[in-house]
């Protein structure tokens, strides 16, 4: 011990320093917790403010209306990051731990993965997939893609969900919206504004992922329009996919995806269309595969040869927008507007006038049908490959669903 140093005073000084350090750490913890809480509230609030609102009149989606014109705010990006990280964690457990996921990693899958990760700027990607259960998205994509991709919102897909399912409640709409899910009105046709809002995301060079059957089909076969209810004339699939492809100034790369087994995770009552269990099932096998990119050049060229040039829809470039704070007067369409660029460019403004110009002609609808049939052929080819590869293990209706069908004399159980 040093001479001249009072031990009691030394201990008192040490206690004071320790107490001060403890108080400082407690204050820092409170600041950290408060900051995290404030950030959380801010991100949730941002997601709430910018959520798609299909129930407004007219339907509103402010972020989609400005797609390609401005960057999303940091808070909105943070909200999306939180949603995709937590979603990836939860569905990775469901697909890879509680169930078995088998992926066919061939050249078509590797092409699909490369397009998701490093697609040339401005080139849109459109994936079309069969629909077996309410958790196909994000379940199948989380199973197919590495976590380093699914945790990056800027790389991930935009998709659509029926407004009466995903956007019925404000809280649900806020969550789905931050997860890059957009509303669609089933049965409202290809000219609805909600499809137009979704289409803007494709025009900006984004990745759009859709289920063109329009509903879940759990029997093992590609669904869509029932046999005898317009299927022979119009095909199985919805025509929205055809419209999105037909009018794009840069034809999107279209990749078909096909999966089996998801119906066993979330069985649906085939008579009432209600989910049979509140939580997904475990102990099942899910398979997934990607197909060859689909070409539509011959269909587009044939249409233009017979009916003239197709209208090509494009978003305004940032250089066409008036400077920040300008009320207008700059060259090009104001924010929220875009144009069909063809031999005679047609500007599509917002509001009712834009809805009128968005309407399709009879000849264009015929083209949409032909494109949708081409997509149908690709998905049926993948289904045939899956049946051949899986043989007797190819899944049909879930056991509970098959039992309900059998009880009501409608058969079922096999694909």
What role is predicted for each listed range?
Residues 143, 188-196, 200, 239, ...:
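Short acidic (Asp/Glu) patches
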Residues 170-174, 206-207, 218-362:
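A cross-family acyltransferase "interaction/gating" segment
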Residues 388-411:
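Short, highly charged C-terminal tails/helix-capping segments
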Residues 121-129, 205-214, 252:
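Generic beta-sheet signal
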Residues 2-8:
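Cytosol/nucleoplasm-facing, intrinsically disordered, low-complexity tails
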